[in-house]
Design a protein with these regions (language model features):
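Surface-exposed, low-hydrophobicity beta-strand/loop segments enriched in small/polar/acidic residues
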Residues: 1-199
């Protein structure tokens, strides 16, 4: 439309969860060697630490990286005394470093979960509408004012779980204001593509 100030952010994310995408099996004394530091989708993921030993209760891994808007964030993931996976709660777009509090009893690996987030726009915007192509599973797409960690969920949409079926919605009047920037949270496999319209 001529003269329109509406912009669009396109999100396509079918990158599966991978439990050793960031750190493959190793026993770092301090800082781990990173196999990868960002995701092919360009988005952010929750981080998961998996241990194989049973003597690692209360040992920690400190994750440093950036959030959906590129700001520096830190999270400490504490392992248990069992050989198991422990997931964090923050979304990392990039990973700068992972540092262990002590050497683990056996190999550990660090990867990503299927919980994902993406930036739509980092500044004040008005949401005008969205088009979501569903994946093979139903799930929520949550719209946050600000980051998922520190912002506020304004509303959510639900995919229908039928692969390649599209949901289109236009926000009436002046749209919905996101004064602290707009980000979305979703589960991989519930969306194939999203076009999010804002001004």
């Amino acid at each position: 439309m001529a003269g329109s100030d509406v912009k669009v952010t396109a999100i396509s994310d079918e990158v599966a969860a991978d439990d050793d995408f960031i750190v493959t099996a190793s026993r770092p004394n301090t800082t781990a060697t990173l196999a990868n530091s960002s995701f092919a989708s360009g988005g952010a993921r929750k981080i998961q630490v998996t241990t194989t030993g049973t003597g690692d209760n209360e040992k920690t891994n400190t994750i440093i990286g950036t959030d959906v808007f590129g700001n520096t964030i830190t999270e400490v993931i504490t392992s248990t005394g069992s050989a198991e996976a422990v997931s964090g709660s923050k979304f990392f777009k990039t990973i700068t470093s992972i540092t262990s509090s002590a050497q683990f009893a056996a190999n550990l690996k660090v990867g990503s979960t299927s919980d994902a987030a993406q930036e739509v726009h980092g500044n004040r915007v008005r949401l005008r509408g969205y088009s979501i192509v569903s994946g093979g599973s139903a799930g929520l797409v949550q719209f946050f004012d600000g980051t998922p960690e520190d912002g506020t969920e304004i509303f959510s949409a639900r995919t229908i779980g039928t692969d390649n079926q599209t949901i289109d919605n236009t926000i009436p009047d002046e749209g919905i204001l996101f004064p602290n920037g707009l980000s979305v949270v979703y589960t991989v496999g519930t969306i194939d593509r999203m076009n999010i319209f804002f001004s």
